Amino acid sequence: MTQANLSETLFKPRFKHPETSTLVHRFNHGAQPPVQSALDGKTIPHWYRMINRLMWIWRGIDPREILDVQARIVMSDAERTDDDLYDTVIGYRGGNWIYEWATQAMVWQQKACAEEDPQLGGRHWLHAATLYNIAAYPHLKGDDLAEQAQALSNRAYEEAAQRLPGTMRQMEFTVPGGAPITGFLHMPKGDGPFPTVLMCGGLDAMQTDYYSLYERYFAPRGIAMLTIDMPSVGFSSKWKLTQDSSLLHQHVLKALPNVPWVDHTRVAAFGFRFGANVAVRLAYLESPRLKAVACLGPVVHTLLSDFKCQQQVPEMYLDVLASRLGMHDASDEALRVELNRYSLKVQGLLGRRCPTPMLSGYWKNDPFSLEEDSRLITSSSADGKLLEIPFNPVYRNFDKGLQEITDWIEKRLC
């Protein structure tokens, strides 16, 4: 089946699909606070989703392309679930967030199919995969159209990997008590086994969102990157996120001695946002298997336990948390009680001495991750490093921060 036909088959209208912003029914919606964050983007009036320009540009999307798609959404006069929010158009049609981003992805998919240069074709496939992931963002459970966009993203990513430098292997990992999960092992040129970074991504991202991290930072240093999806999304969608947030990643770590391309004696974990919750748990629970753990904007305690902090984050992010926890109809009070159990300090881990070297990078005044959380991580480690990343200029400092983190990881792996 051709890619175009696959797209048509997946998105063929069958019934009235639920609109993304209606999937989580929290009772205590408050006023939307203005938020700006390097890792999560910013709240913009009249948009349900946070607009994450930095990360989308970092993943290879042209800023003008972002504005073009946003303009098509804004200009639509189709029915919306909330007339005050542009990105709530009902149904898979013009103006709908998923429709417009998926349509943009198909443009690049067609370019990829027509391209004779394999490497350039690989770039086009990767571009399409990224756009399909933006279409599916923020990846709420039960969003049928988003899940179809994710399927197309994974397919485009596999096509890209066949054409881009290095090698990617799709791997299946067995997890007792449930369905197996699929991960992607990205390997640089040369002979393995390679030192490897196990990526622990944020709750509003897919494992295929981190190719730029591998290509620009790990591959040039001869380091492989292994990704899996976080519980409840993508290839890990059959697993619910629980207080044992590191369960899937632990089983992957335990399987690495049987993976011939990975040097299981030289493995580090890298956690973005809530992925840092996973990575820090691994530092405590699997310290013999890890040489180092790095975190960026970690969500490990304050946001999970402090009501005032939770009031400062956007509705969309609270919806993502509720969706991952399977609490689609919960009040904010019920959600708050449950989130508290995910705090690594409440769990009795953070604050105890940890033998694993840990680095934590943070931005001042980050509403999702306070400086205190990063200090708690690094002060708990026998070999801790605290890294403050200045906000402006945001892109340059983000790149510089990632370079410093990669240098730190490399010294402990190589």
UniProtKB/Swiss-Prot annotation:
Protein name as catalogued: Esterase FrsA
Cysteine pairings via disulfide bonds: none
Source organism phylogeny: Bacteria, Pseudomonadati, Pseudomonadota, Gammaproteobacteria, Enterobacterales
Species in which this protein is naturally found: Shigella dysenteriae serotype 1 (strain Sd197)
Physiological role: Catalyzes the hydrolysis of esters.
Recorded coiled-coil stretches: none
InterPro entries (alphabetical): AB_hydrolase_fold (IPR029058), FrsA (IPR043423), FrsA-like (IPR010520), FrsA_esterase (IPR050261)
Catalytic activity: a carboxylic ester + H2O = an alcohol + a carboxylate + H(+)
EC number: 3.1.1.1
Gene name of this polypeptide: frsA
Keyword line: Hydrolase, Serine esterase
GO function terms (MF aspect): carboxylesterase activity
A Pfam family annotated for this UniProt entry: FrsA-like
Family under the similarity heading: Belongs to the FrsA family.
